[in-house]
Amino acid sequence: MRNIPRRRRHECRRGTPRACATTAIVTMGLFCCPLWAAEPDWPVVEKHALELLQKYVRIASVNPPANTVEAAALIKGELEAAGFTPKLYSSGPDGQTNLIVRLPGRDRSKKPLLLLNHFDVVPVDAKAWGMDPFAAIIKDGQIWGRGALDMKGLAVEQMTALIELKRAGIVPPRDIVMLSTCDEESNGKLGIQWMVNNHFDELDPAYVLDEGGAGSRELFTPGKLVFGIAVGQKQSLWLRLSAKGTAGHGSQPIADNANTILMDAIRKAMNAPPATKPVPVVEEMKRAVGGTFANNKFVNATLDNTMSLTTLQSGVGSPVKVNVIPSTAEATIDCRLLPGVNADEFQSDIKARINDPRVTVERLSEPVDAGVSSSETPLFAAMRTALLKEHPTAVVMPMLVPYGTDEVRLRIRGIPSYGFMPMVLDTATIATMHSDQERIPVVEFLRGIRIYFDVLRSDY
């Protein structure tokens, strides 16, 4: 009865029927109605979450090889200490481990909400860091380390919100399942794809919340706080251009040089990419920010089809001989296509523009066009409400992200899937993802836990 006002407790002891009835209703509410559940002890919760994130980042769960045994053990232990029964699934020979945990909801007949995150992180160039990339030190109000932003910080937010929901006695409207995968950074073959292929019955969600999107006062438009919730992502079309020429001595230039043939093909392929047709979600983004976007690489990549020259390979011998003209040369191009763009037509257009029988264009990846999830759902509304509670003047909009995430494997099945990162980040911080000096602001990390908690206890 600690949540019942003192005056009413005294009335109940005196036996007043009305007071006793009020007490009974409130007491029942503590066990039946989420609105009457106690709030978490946030200072204690936040201190523990911060320490947990540091422990998590200190585990170098680098992919390759995606050995996530230690990371999975840490998260499993946290969940078990909170009264959950997580399950581990081994999906590969080198310690690739996935984790599932479930919090039952009020209506077990409804499909669950899936919280999706990943254990693995990309490799580091330790020499380029000014510190140990796995030390997880706190400096200048931020946690520094590989995986802090992508995506161990968000994973701890999801898990902490889930744990506090259970501790507060709040029963969500439907089951909530959390899935942590082992190899998001290698296209998910042993992670999300393996789980979907082998244990979809454990998932089968109504909605998915994953990484992607964020809030920023400068990323989308200068001086305006905008939160983007990812409702779709671009298709990944990786191409290899191979040129054939005539080998020769470097002292005697020839026209049929594979390197110059390749350079000309790259120029033709990339100088005039196919025109972009209007995409509804991009038009909605433009309206949300008032028609004017910031000019930066992230936004520019979101609004259009893009092509990046990523590798060049040529030469003869090891070490490569400078005085030998090679007979072959290769390049790879990372093409990212907007939803609805036909990848076959895009590739054919590139071949037609190159128009050189000495050059072949080979596809290295099969793009997945999963479409765009609706922003007119109860879950999207819950995310908007939770964000505006913390940031009343913010603009909340659906958006595309230029990169790929695990959620595409579920969106392709028609499941509404969202990239939801409830933190305000500047462009410099966002740029550290997969780069050097990766970090996450402590204040925003902790605020994100509260926002996630509000979303999970909503009606969706």
Question: Which sequence ranges carry the predicted segments?
Answer:
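Acidic/histidine-rich catalytic neighborhood of metal-dependent amide-processing enzymes
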Residues: 143, 149-228
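Sec-exported extracytoplasmic/periplasmic mature domains
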Residues: 54-61, 76, 80-85, 163-167, ...
